[in-house]
Regions:
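C-terminal edge-of-domain segments
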Residues: 82-129, 184-224
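Conserved mixed alpha/beta catalytic, RNA-binding, or beta-rich assembly cores of soluble enzyme
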Residues: 29-55, 60-78, 113, 121-179
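N-terminal mitochondrial targeting presequence
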Residues: 1-26
Length: 224
């Protein structure tokens, strides 16, 4: 068993289980995020939908766009903090196939995107736990095996990410963890989600910033 504080980097491959988990229901409105999307404007649109009680999703393609989406979610939480009454934004990641695009040559291309389901939820407990560090080289399947054990034992698990690629790996690991929990009959009517926040830490003489994902089970009804 790997220690919880260990860096999960450059690990041997396990079965590559990750794939599209289904296409979102037709007619459900969603927000789009690219690498060049203005974080503040997207956060404003997201917080407006949350105030209205609407089911909210963000679609992003590629690590840079997904990183921008996560930053927008953190800013949106600040925007709606007064109305939230102590609640936080809990995010459930999913992978979906977007509508095919037709190139000028007539060839259709299929794109897979992250779809981040965002909802107001009660804060997840923060226990005295070591961080699990996610890197760009982390194997998400192997990481998920560790996360399953921690979630089953403690109920929550904190992940630390630095950069867009490590955040994308963390999202994949969270999705696979949810699948494993379902197979172990530990999910029930709940979903595995995360709350994202910035964390400043000291590394030698340098101050650095990372993103922490506090992962845990929330009511699945939040996203239905």
């Amino acid at each position: 068993m790997l220690p919880r504080g260990a860096m999960l980097g450059r690990l041997p491959l396990v079965a590559q289980r990750l794939g599209a988990r289904g296409v979102a229901a037709e007619g459900v409105p969603g927000l789009q995020c690219s690498a060049k999307t203005n974080v503040g404007k997207l956060a404003g649109a997201l917080s407006a939908r949350l105030r209205e009680g609407a089911k909210t999703t963000l679609d992003s393609v590629g690590p840079a766009a997904t990183y921008t989406a996560i930053k927008s979610i953190m800013v949106a939480e600040d925007y709606c903090s007064q109305e939230a009454q102590g609640k936080v934004l809990a995010v459930r990641p999913e992978m979906v196939k977007l509508d095919p695009r037709t190139a000028p040559s007539g060839r259709e291309t299929q794109t897979v995107a992250f779809r981040l389901h965002v909802a107001l939820a009660d804060p997840l407990p923060e226990l005295d736990q070591e961080l699990t560090y996610m890197s760009a080289d982390t194997n998400p399947g192997l990481a998920a095996r560790l996360l399953v054990r921690v979630v089953e034992d403690k109920g929550v698990v904190p992940l630390a990410c630095m950069g867009d690629k490590s955040c994308g790996i963390a999202l994949r690991a969270i999705m696979i963890t949810e699948e494993f929990l379902g197979r172990n009959n530990k999910l029930g009517t709940k979903a595995l989600a995360f709350h994202a926040k910035k964390d400043t830490f000291q590394q030698g003489s340098e101050e650095r910033v990372r993103i922490l994902f506090q992962c845990g089970l929330v009511p699945g009804s939040l996203y239905k």
